[in-house]
Amino acid sequence: MEKLIAHLKSQGFIFQGSEIYGGLANSWDYGPLGVEVKNKLKQAWWNHFVRKNPYNIGLDSSIILNSSVWKASGHIDGFNDPLIDCKKCNSRWRADKLIEEFNSEINAGVMTENQMEEFIREQNIKCPKCQACDFTQIRKFALMFKTNQGVLEDESSSVYLRPETAQGIFINFKNAQRSLRKKLPFGIGQIGKSFRNEITPGNFIFRTREFEQMELEFFFNPSDEKDWFSYWLNEVETFLQDKIQINKENYRVRSHEKDELAHYSTATSDIEFKFPFGWGELWGVAHRGNFDLNAHQEASKQDLTYLDPTTNQKVLPHVIEPSVGVERMMLAILWQAYHEEDLGEGNSRIVMKLPYNLAPYQIAVMPLQKQQNDQAQALYSNLLNNFDVTYDETGNVGKRYRRQDAIGTPFVITVDFDTPETNSVTVRERDSMEQVRINLDELEAYLKAKF
């Protein structure tokens, strides 16, 4: 992992947040190349789950919502972690994580606070920092970032940074349905920032306090006999394998046991990825029932039911939610792509084998020598009309190839001494390093076929 982090920083993918001021813990900035991968990932998700799906539409809801939303959803009262302090070194930990790291077979999420305290005491679980076995009682730690809106700083002006994008979709269910005259079943997709004041964030960008989510809430009539849960789980796997080329051996699907289910869920399956630190949740697909719409209907006193045009009966739709974090998906993609290769005879290379559609640049154009600059520049300008292209003229050809390998550029086009006479260029593919000669009249068609 450390090698990957160092590589991503040196190549302009991800930087430490606020680095010139000593950094800010758990804060990361996406550099010139990282933001390209991130935006292409989000675009791929949007195309697959919203734009190209016959059922779904999009939304962009506010980050700051009326606090009543979070009261109704249960976040204000129930969105917290069990916090415990070491009396010796004053470090703070999540009690449930201490237990689960001590014994991975235990699901501490179903234990009461008293049960967790007793287990920690009986098993003599040690503080990871100082190795002492002396902890405070567990107390609840609210995970939502709280602030004030306007000039007053009292409870009447209290607002929260959203901990998830889902609630913005639920409270806009009727607006979206009415305005576009949508009939069940249909879904609403959203990409946006969320914030959670995690006690123990970590593992690079896997768990951060500021993160981005790609969520879909799919509404359907509870009498609908189609297995929508399996449908969306299959769509998630299709996206992973076909759209962003996550290797099947690198992920697994795990269904939650009854005692693991969230209070709103009747069924949940996690897609877990084999990260460098072990298996971790990548994507969740949850059957939320009508929990959220019912909660907001009761709290707001607004009718959120759907009038079925066939039966003329009002129904409160049920919901399937596929939800994934952008940063976690980024980490999975970048980790899978990173390769150190021995080329023999003392030569090696670092290559980012990114999916072609997610690479920061699709193509690099470079002149073999300065004499070819004008023709190479003209080709570069022409290709910019249809591709994401970079121009590289610094250093010898071998170094430039390695530089493009290191950032994941799929194809490098070299304009050389023969180009003016033959009207052709050399095209090198990243993963195989194979080179072919392509006529300039056929170059664009050749490249389009690759993407």
Swiss-Prot record:
Substrate binds at R94, E164, F211, E212, Q213, M214, E215, E321, P322, S323, V324, G325. The keyword tRNA processing does not apply. GO terms for molecular function: ATP binding; glycine-tRNA ligase activity; protein dimerization activity. It is found in: Cytoplasm. GO terms for biological process: glycyl-tRNA aminoacylation. It comes from the Bacteria. Its EC number is 6.1.1.14. ATP binds at residues 196-198, 206-211, 281-282, 325-328. It catalyses: tRNA(Gly) + glycine + ATP = glycyl-tRNA(Gly) + AMP + diphosphate. Keywords: Aminoacyl-tRNA synthetase, ATP-binding, Cytoplasm, Ligase, Nucleotide-binding, Protein biosynthesis. The keyword Protein biosynthesis applies. InterPro entries: aa-tRNA-synt_IIb, aa-tRNA-synth_II, aa-tRNA-synth_II/BPL/LPL, Anticodon-bd, Anticodon-bd_dom_sf, Gly-tRNA_synthase/POLG2, Gly_tRNA_ligase_bac, GlyRS-like_core. GO terms for cellular component: cytoplasm. Pfam families: HGTP_anticodon, tRNA-synt_2b. Catalyzes the attachment of glycine to tRNA(Gly). Belongs to the class-II aminoacyl-tRNA synthetase family. PANTHER family: DNA POLYMERASE SUBUNIT GAMMA-2, MITOCHONDRIAL, GLYCYL-TRNA SYNTHETASE/DNA POLYMERASE SUBUNIT GAMMA-2. Homodimer. This is Glycine--tRNA ligase. It comes from Mesoplasma florum (strain ATCC 33453 / NBRC 100688 / NCTC 11704 / L1).
